[in-house]
Amino acid sequence: MDQFIKQDETGDLIETGMNVANHFLSAPIQGTNSLSKASIIPGVAPVLIGNPEQKNIQHPTASHQGSKSKGSGSGVRSIIVPPSEAGNGGTQDPEPLFAQTGQGGIVTTVYQDPTIQPTGSSRSVELAKIGKERMINRFVEKPRISTPVTEFKRGGPGAAAQGQTIQEEGIDGNGASAGSKERSGSLSGATLYAHLSLPQQDSTPANVGIAPQSAISANEIMDLLRGMDARLQHLEQKVDKVLAQGSMVTQIKNELSTVKTTLATIEGMMATVKIMDPGNPTGVPVDELRRSFSDHVTIVSGPGDVPFSSSEEPTLYLDELARPVSKPRPAKQTKPQPVKDLAGRKVMITKMITDCVANPQMKQAFEQRLAKASTEDALNDIKRDIIRSAI
């Protein structure tokens, strides 16, 4: 037999299960005629356990009119059996729980004679059991508690909303789904349309926060004390370094003051040297300076007449021999140069030899030259040599 069930066979199986459910739901229960476990056919017991009895089981050899009348009265659907199988009343049905469809033949119900042992496969029995349970549970309404739809609020629900507990409907096995609240109008089990699922809150939302650390990773008090001790020692070392830098700063300040004092002394000595030896500021010889200040031609340009003027007078004079000559120029008289006082310069140079020359031999040589000097130029040469030796 093919292990895969076709779509038509599945539909017939579902309709058969629905008819079985309607039959047991509509039929009255009689305790005296209830089936016991001993009277149930082996192999069909899992399907019929927990169901009411079914009355007037039709045998395959029953008449067509009796089956039709009982099937219409009890809600059981009649099934047409092929003529080839109708004559064999004692033969076993290969699939006892499947609905058999065909054209013509004897009409019989889906229930088999208890005396006939079924030879159907276990897969067919299980499929029949599953289809029957689903059809029965589909039309059995259970009291359901509707889940309240809470409105979303920013920041999470309040204290009152958090205190409420949401009761969920338990599902025992293959129970009815809580998503549909209306009973289906189709007896074939087909879903006409799907209802829109409303947003349901399955559980109470929890506020999101930082999870506390596990107690296993908590530090002991001794570890904390050791860490604090290490940090304290580190800070003490830094403080010692800062204090050491403070003493160094004081030393730098003292050295800086010494440098300033030395610089002031050098500046004073340089000022003294400038006063004693002014010299030529430009370093240009005197002859060049006189040449630059000599007479030169001056050109006057611009509008207007420039009257001619001559520095010489047109008067002629007679010399000693009565010769006409121009006005004689007076002879230049050289002015005697004043004698400069060299005594003060010698005293200043003697003081410089004493302060600036440390070598006794050089000091003695400068004193001898100073005693022999009689002109200003000689004194200036001695002064320059003293300054050079000091540098």
Swiss-Prot record:
Record has Transit peptide as a keyword: no
InterPro entries: P/V_Pprotein_paramyxoviral
Ranges in a coiled coil: 218-245
Gene3D superfamilies xref list: 1.20.5.300, DNA helicase RuvA subunit, C-terminal domain
CDD domains: MEV_P-protein-C_like
UniProt entry keywords in alphabetical sequence: Coiled coil, Phosphoprotein, Viral RNA replication
Phosphothreonine carried by residues: 10, 16, 91, 150, 165, 250, 258, 282, 298, 375
Polar residues composition-biased segments: 54-65
Pfam families in alphabetical order: Paramyx_P_V_C
Residue numbers bearing the Phosphoserine modification: 69, 188, 257, 292, 294, 301, 374
Assembly and oligomerization: Homotetramer. Interacts (via multimerization domain) with polymerase L; this interaction forms the polymerase L-P complex. Interacts (via N-terminus) with N0 (via Ncore); this interaction allows P to chaperon N0 to avoid N polymerization before encapsidation. Interacts (via C-terminus) with N-RNA template; this interaction positions the polymerase on the template for both transcription and replication. Interacts with host RPS6KB1 kinase; this interaction may play a role in the viral replication and transcription.
Domain commentary: The N-terminus consists of a long intrinsically disordered tail. The central part contains the coiled-coil multimerization domain (MD or OD). Forms a four-stranded coiled coil structure. The C-terminus constitutes the alpha-helical X domain (XD) that binds to the nucleocapsid (N-RNA complex) and the L polymerase.
Protein name as catalogued: Phosphoprotein
